[in-house]
Amino acid sequence: MPQIIAKCNGRVLVGTVISDKNDKTIIVHVETLVKHPLLKKFIRHRKKFTAHDPLNECSIGDTVKIIEFRPLSRNKRWHLVAILEKAV
């Protein structure tokens, strides 16, 4: 990965790749747990992020780390940092 990514101070998320059909683009599914202030129970928040994969090295099911970056297109504002676990 380029050095410019390592210096970026954006948010870092970990998620699972659910689509890699587009060229140099992946869609990452991120799930977070948030505690409800009144009910005191944990609620799952799920969101999809479109991320830039410059080397087309991800496949469906991989666990990846993405970082917030400058806008690359209308929907792409995230960049692939590392593949934490390859899919079987």
UniProtKB/Swiss-Prot annotation:
Signal peptide: none annotated. Pfam families: Ribosomal_S17. It comes from the Bacteria. Keywords: Ribonucleoprotein, Ribosomal protein, RNA-binding, rRNA-binding. GO terms for molecular function: rRNA binding; structural constituent of ribosome. GO terms for cellular component: cytosolic small ribosomal subunit. GO terms for biological process: translation. PROSITE patterns: RIBOSOMAL_S17 (PS00056). One of the primary rRNA binding proteins, it binds specifically to the 5'-end of 16S ribosomal RNA. Part of the 30S ribosomal subunit. Belongs to the universal ribosomal protein uS17 family. This is Small ribosomal subunit protein uS17.
